[in-house]
Amino acid sequence: MLKGIHPALSPELLKVLAEMGHGDEIVLSDAHFPAHQLHHKVIRADGIQIATLLEAITPLFEYDQYVERPLAMMQAVHGDSLDLAVEERYLAAIAKINGKAPLVERVERFAFYDRAKIAYAVVITGELAKYGNIILKKGVTPVLTD
C-alpha cells in the first residue's frame, strides 16, 4: 500500500495511468465488455464499480481540456434504452474530486468498440450497468511551479 493512493488502484493500473501520454485513452468497461477480443492490454478490476474507480483515478488524472468532450460512453442501440443515472453516477464521482465533471460524448456501439481497440488499455470492472462503459481521454498534466 502507498499513502494517498486509493485501494481500488492496483499496481498494474497505476503503472498504466503513469505511462499514458496526453491524448491517450483508457476504457473502464463493464463486466460484460469484450475486452480480450478488442485489446491486448487488459487490466482486471473485478468487483470494483466504475464510479469507485473514477473517484480513485481522478485525483491522479488530468482530463483532456483541449477537446470538448474528454469522456465517451456508448449510446443505446436503436430500440434499446439506457439508464441515465449511470452517467450521472460517473459524473458525480468525478465532480466529488474535481468540483465539476467534463462533458460526455455518446458514441455508437461499434464506433465505441473501434475506439477501445486503439485505447491505451482496457480495464474490466465489476460494473453491471447496461451501457456502463466509459472512455477517459488524458490531458496535459499541469506543471507545478515554485
UniProtKB/Swiss-Prot annotation:
What superkingdom heads the lineage? Bacteria
Q: Where do the annotations place substrate binding?
A: D30, R109, Y131, G132, N133
InterPro entries, alphabetized:
L-fucose_mutarotase, RbsD-like_sf, RbsD/FucU_mutarotase, RbsD_FucU
Q: Which GO terms describe its molecular function?
A: fucose binding; L-fucose mutarotase activity
Query: Where is the protein found, in the record's own terms?
Result: Cytoplasm
What does this chain do? Answer: Involved in the anomeric conversion of L-fucose.
What does the subunit comment say?
Homodecamer.
Q: Indicate what this protein is called per its UniProt record.
A: L-fucose mutarotase
| Organism of origin | Glaesserella parasuis serovar 5 (strain SH0165)
